[in-house]
């Protein structure tokens, strides 16, 4: 069963979407992930939905994820304001 993590992040100024795309691309080869979606809520806030292959894959990725989050906070002053996570129990595919 896939595992979904949804977060909201606050930036100190307008988002640098080009830099964010470069950062996100670093996760492309991560075998634990199915996909990551980042979306704009407003010019200084973005949402993220990360889909992992399973809860075990999420847990295997946790140390790397914590490291990335710390860097985002320490270097770029981006702060997480919300997190929700859980196993996916239904998927609508068109």
Residue ranges and their predicted role:
Residues 1-47, 53-67, 74-94:
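Short S/T/G/P-rich N-terminal loop/turn motif that feeds into the first structured element of a domain
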